[in-house]
Amino acid sequence: MGARCRSFSALLLLLQVSSWLCQQPESESDSCRPGFSSEVYTFLVPERHLERGHILGRVKFEGCTGRPRTAFFSEDSRFKVSTDGVITVKRHLKLHKLETSFLVHAWDSSYRKLSTKVTLKSLGHHHHRHHHRDPVSESNPELLTFPSFHQGLRRQKRDWVIPPINCPENQKGEFPQRLVQIKSNRDKETTVFYSITGPGADKPPVGVFIIERETGWLKVTQPLDREAIDKYLLYSHAVSSNGEAVEDPMEIVVTVTDQNDNRPEFIQEVFEGSVAEGALPGTSVMQVSATDADDDINTYNAAIAYTILSQDPELPHKNMFTVNRDTGVISVVTSGLDRESYPTYTLVVQAADLQGEGLSTTAKAVITVKDINDNAPIFNPSTYQGQVLENEVGARIATLKVTDDDAPNTPAWNAVYTVVNDPDHQFTVITDPKTNEGILKTAKGLDFEAKQQYILHVTVENEEPFEGSLVPSTATVTVDVVDVNEAPIFVPAEKRVEVPEDFGVGLEIASYTAREPDTFMEQKITYRIWRDTANWLEINPETGVISTRAEMDREDSEHVKNSTYTALIIATDDGSPIATGTGTLLLVLSDVNDNAPIPEPRNMQFCQRNPKPHVITILDPDLPPNTSPFTAELTHGASVNWTIEYNDAEQESLILQPRKDLEIGEYKINLKLSDNQNKDQVTTLEVHVCDCEGTVNNCMKAISLEAGLQVPAILGILGGILALLILILLLLLFLRRRTVVKEPLLPPDDDTRDNVYYYDEEGGGEEDQDFDLSQLHRGLDARPEVIRNDVAPTLMSMPQYRPRPANPDEIGNFIDENLKAADSDPTAPPYDSLLVFDYEGSGSEAASLSSLNSSESDQDQDYDYLNEWGNRFKKLADMYGGGEED
């Protein structure tokens, strides 16, 4: 272990620094002065070619920061300065001069930049490399001593930095193994005990390094792993037997040197790249990359070299690609890449450390050959024919088919069609994104009367320009135009006519006609108005002459916009099918002074006390000069209580206010307004004077209705209506409570008649010679009034009954006429009501009551003649004509 862990050059450097410190006066050691130990450092290099990681030497800097490490900066980016001052080569380089100089910077505790110059001197090629002894990394010193001072035991003002101790990782053998012995110069004066502190000693990982207490031998207790910890910073201590420090702590840096124990690892298992077909040799395709956990600065253990092991397919050449040994960039080395033949290549790439001589690993690189436009699309077939109806836009004419050997759905495959001989851009070709076919359509309507057939030449290319000298393919398309009945066309499509608004009724405004585009057809055109919202116009269907049918009004805001009235006229031909064209008639109505000015508002409220004036705006729908300036005047005595004055110089508004305090109530103000052309009008303003002061907020005016009636009049009207309703209710109540006195149909048994006698015995003749004809009226005139209360009464005329005649001979006619009146009487009692007749009349066929049963034949018992008297006597006939008794 001792031979591999020694560094004679480091020991020499330590002794030189120690000697220099011993020669310094005491005054300089008392204060810390920041700066480099030398203004110029000169390092000898064996040859001009320097490999990466080569150690040149070390610079020393005191920053007075109390920290053992310092950040350095090299102005030459080819060199790296670590925090311990060691200068190494960052990458392979060649020194073109015998001397190369650069500056190294560092900063002190006050952030002041300090610099030193580093010079490299080349010894030339005759000095072989193994004759050069590296001052830092060759071996470790066998003995390290604490610095000594002239004046006894004192704590030094600056840290004591020694060269690092190198120890290889993964050491085999028995442990612990000695690294270096630490010795104090005062071990002859007193017994000295040694100890170490820091990570790896008394801090995690604890126990990696130990020191023999009496001898000062620093030992390592286990194999080291540089990939885990590449450097240990320890502090050695020397104390006397009584525990007093005899030396200041000394920094010990143990650097773990690398062994090639890690193989390279690709950052990806499969790398993907692409290159255009036909790429020239030297074209970069992609880059593969691998990493190695070993030391890539001081050793070649992580120096990776790349090679291609295999290529699949090995066509058209075995080695189509090459890889840069150092960078891993894969490039084309042979021409002949053709996507249509070999679209992909798979390479097996190896990465090996020790510049290709050490551990290795492999990965795949998949290279896709990108398509270029080296194949032109070809029409198949190259001639087409189609037809289209005239005036149709976007009509499909033909489908153009092409073939292209390039990769589908790429710019080199996507077809772009162009109609060569189409100067008016009447046609267009749209590419179907799925099939790559070209759809030929009309971009504008075609006119059969202008041209009946088109012969088009269509070329096809790709979105991506052609590679090389490819020629676009051309197809010929014959298009036949089919004639259709076209609608008449108004000339112009929008006709503007200016007329005064008082143009009159029945007068001709203009002639608006359309032309027939179908010149090969003889068709008749008729006209009619399609839209005339105000019904002002009429048109001659044969000639297209438009006339007025009603008075026009420019101020009609519903139908007139910006003094323009719009009407739509249609023209219809008699073709098959019928076609209709539309034209627009714009009537610009010039203004006439047909409107007098009016005030706004017309209803106002004033306070009775200290009233605020009101502003009245004058409105006139006419146009200048038939409007302002306006003239205003109070008429019909309104100026007695009110005053007006103009509110502006244009006289377009007025100020109205009362002349004096007025009573609360309503006032009518007649205001005459005239425009600039003396068109005037008198308008009545309604003004309410309220019980308030100043500005009207809540108008307290006399209680009145808007109709103008006073309260007493309203109360009188309501009282009359109420009295009439009460009278009607009383009348109805009286009618319902009226009592009807009915006379009995038959007289009581004890009723004594003067001329009627009763006979209780048979035989003899009738003695009643005297009779009273007034009794015949009991069934008609003296009948009780019958009123139905189950239905609403109907209004109808009462039947007229004939009065009793004075002549007894007319009694028959009297009965017949009154019988008919009774039959038509709706208020008559039911048919089965009992009627009493006290007088039988003269000439009775019955000589006596005793002879009723003495009839000798059925003729005598026939009562059918009673049916001739009406329904009322039918019951009587049924009662007495039922047949003979048993």
From Swiss-Prot:
Domain Cadherin residue range list: 159-266, 267-379, 380-490, 491-597, 598-701
Acidic residues: bias regions: 759-771
Chain positions covered by the region annotation Required for binding alpha, beta and: 815-886
Positions carrying Phosphotyrosine: Y757, Y758, Y759
Binding site for Ca(2+) 2: D261
Protein residues bound to Ca(2+) 1: D261
Residue ranges of the propeptide: 24-158
Protein name in the entry: Cadherin-1
Gene this protein is translated from: Cdh1
